[in-house]
Amino acid sequence: MGFTEQYDVVVVGAGHAGCEAAMAAARMGLRTALYTLNVDLIAQMSCNPAVGGIAKGHLVREVDALGGIMGEVTDAVGIQFRLLNTSRGPAVWSPRAQCDKQQYRLKMREVLESEPNLKIKQAEVADLIVEDVSDPTHPERMKIARGIKLRDGRTVGALAVVITTGTFLNGLIHCGEEQYPAGRSGEPASVLLGESLKKMGLRGCRLKTGTPPRLDGRSIDWSKFAVQPGDAEPTPFSFRTKKITQKQVPCYIAHTTPETHQLIRENVHRSPMYSGQIQSTGPRYCPSIEDKIVKFPDKETHQIFLEPEGLNTYEVYVNGMSTSLPIDVQLRMVHSIVGLENAEMLRPGYAIEYDSIDPTELQRTLETKKIGSLYLGGQINGTSGYEEAACQGLMAGINAALAVKHEPPLVLDRTEAYTAILIDDLISKGTNEPYRMFTSRAEFRLHLRIDNADRRLTPHGRRVGLIKDEAWHAHLAKQQRMDELKMTLEKTRIRTSELPVELAEKFGNIDGSTVVQLLKRPESDVAAFEQIIRRVQPTFFERGDSEREFVSDIRNELKAVETEIKYAGYLDQQTKAIDRLKRSEQRVIPEWFDYASVSGLSREMCEKMQRVRPQTIGQASRIPGVTPAAVSLINVYIEIQGRKQKATT
């Protein structure tokens, strides 16, 4: 058929997933079009004006390491940076940044428009153009995507289509008793495309999410709240960011009161979630304030955070108070909090229901099983959060481009990336609630740290064409610097007199010990040895005209070296365990294996295994509800019971 326009890759939806997908395909040399309902709202932060957080920060680092753009944009517009979980081990350290909401979308648009292979188009996509085919290599696949049809009748041909529509498919907003179709507040829902996907035979379900009210900062008594400052030395998201230059501002901590809780209890019947108006499932780990009060009735107060939405606005995001209660109740609820007695509400909170596609309909490349050349990424796959969306969009865009170029797909292993864990969980087990990433979902999280995301994934980005020469050479130089520093510290022996007084008192006499030996002690850190490092390897600090421009670079690399030294033994153990796990994917589970004998295996897991009786470890890992930890336990006990069997025969 004839098309109005023709592209290699078409991306539908310009949220966080769509931006990554479109940019990836375009940077890989393909003519790409990004379609959105409103070009002025590209990469709009629909909810929290922040990027990162526990595990989410890991995802952003991985997106950056592969050649994505979320990290660089966040670094350019972040107005408060905090490294979370620093009281725990480095495996779970995670960066988070409060962003200037307006500047974020403007910067993202600037980056997208700088790519010559990418065209941004404003139009409503109404339908997919699908061709019936017979493919002997994929007998289950009888259709292939050939392009899209716009509401105005134009047709756009494409060799691959990526759909990243977020909450827009048949979106329905709820605020008290009021409900109306919308993709998010003030924007229309994508009804025609939603119905089109249903007709294609793709299984789906309705999911729900919500957002809190926004307040006018000029009407808030800031003196009543505890100040939550950012880090004095911000940790960037991008490995290519040398220094954070944006002005930094604090957030504030407030608390709900008994009056708040009583007000919610008296009006909970007016909440769509409790009146029966909303039937779909919301995010378990981001509950509404109604949910918190109902499910934790004994809790006297709940913490909330007042977060600025930007440097050029007074709008304040009330983190922790997501709600779909009626507007009059929301206003009274806000006024019941100390310091917010006179606060003016700029926007009310609301809940939104939307269509998602069952992610078990997808292959590991995020291409649909039933329709070839059709890829899905982001909330349409059942996830929640900007970061989860971005990593999926990036992978969908990469694999769509690779397919068009007839090159092998990029499929990451769950032992090398949180991105892979997210995708593997979704396609293997599906989800009936918005999926959120946690570090606890990883079997080998000490290997999946934020500091080594580039070491793990940048070679993949280079292979597919997203890491250009300058960035690649910088990456290689960094790895060489760090390797050389580790070797130098292994050879450098020092005297007690060279140590800072406090450390010398803790260590006692350490004459003749190497720096590596001392760094392995829990009470030491690399900062104490900076002067020694400057003496034995001054080139480590030589980064150009001004060392000050590379402060975060140097600090992060030193910390990464310290982590690899301090946890070397554990890392070696996990490397061996990873090798064993990869080999065991195909390991047969003997018929005689006794699940009840596995210490630490919950009754629920045991019952699932006894009922299904999987034949291999790989099959067991894909049973819905079976955790990676349970699979690891079974894997270990197969070895133990196998040795016992041999000993008795």
Curated annotation (Swiss-Prot):
Family: Belongs to the MnmG family.
Reported function: NAD-binding protein involved in the addition of a carboxymethylaminomethyl (cmnm) group at the wobble position (U34) of certain tRNAs, forming tRNA-cmnm(5)s(2)U34.
Species of the source: Koribacter versatilis (strain Ellin345)
Gene Ontology CC terms, in alphabetical order: cytosol
Cysteine pairs bridged by disulfides in the record: none
Protein name in UniProt: tRNA uridine 5-carboxymethylaminomethyl modification enzyme MnmG
Compartment(s) of residence: Cytoplasm
UniProt: FAD binding residues: 13-18, 125, 190, 379
